[in-house]
């Protein structure tokens, strides 16, 4: 009996055997945990059906013939959750999907990425009779907008709870099959910005030249990041240019929707794609949203005073930017040289 108990105990504490068969990929690195067990990577888990297709769509990202043939492709991506204040970014992706009638390609909904106690599946009524269970996922679709000379891939889904590097590798594997050469990531954050002014849009670019092209100021932020920042880093590391746009949503009205921020992000998409993005009734929704928030804030003297202080601070920053923008750099340098000459010993004697 003692021997049997000891055998059971030994089996319980014995380390699991290591995986020995791994698919190699020049793009992916293999990570191991502290016990030496190999962590899952996208290339090693293809056979585990990490990607679940839409009906009548692609069955495996490894089968090139099952993907649509796209060229000069650009990705527009957004992630729900921490990266999506007021649902501004995800609403922008849903708008693009609707107006351009995007065709679905694949859906990544593997439970290796999601904690269902944090991001729970949702039950929806269908025709008032049957019910549909919707799992947290990442949906990937494509389209060719009218007047565009390139294909657009839309990536929209829920920020994963775990295995972010594997998740990004999965998205990059799909991007590689679709001949993606540029990635645009949309996000939204809560900020000290008034709802009565244009929505500030900041961002992160892959090079100083791209930052200048898209009018992005150099960011000095250091701190936690979400899957949007991780995915951008993964894209750049794999050789795909990627830029992220962040719309600032007033923190005192953080509940979705935030149509004004959504419009601001779509304007940025227009700049990158160099085509007009139909906004439908979004501008009208943005006006109604601003009026409703104004009415709400004016009912509370303390909040109204706070909003006014944000307006004054923002206007002062804009005025200073305009002043600095009018300064002639060459004239300023010449004046500085004259100042230095005046400071030299013996000047004017």
Task: Tell me the role of every PLM-derived stretch.
Residues 3-5, 31-32:
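Intrinsic low-complexity, disordered N-terminal segments enriched in polar/charged/small residues
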Residues 9-10, 38, 42-52:
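Ala/Thr-enriched low-complexity intrinsically disordered regions
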Residues 11, 19-36:
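Polybasic, low-complexity intrinsically disordered segments
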Residues 53-157:
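N-terminal short beta-loop-beta anion/metal-coordinating cradle
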Residues 79-83, 154-164, 214-222, 252-256:
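Flexible, glycine/proline-enriched loop segments at strand-loop-helix junctions
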Residues 150, 157-208, 231:
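Internal, conserved structured core segments that host functional sites
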Residues 192-272, 276:
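Catalytic cores of processing enzymes, dominated by hydrolases/peptidases
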Residues 253-349:
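A conserved C-terminal secondary-structure "cap"
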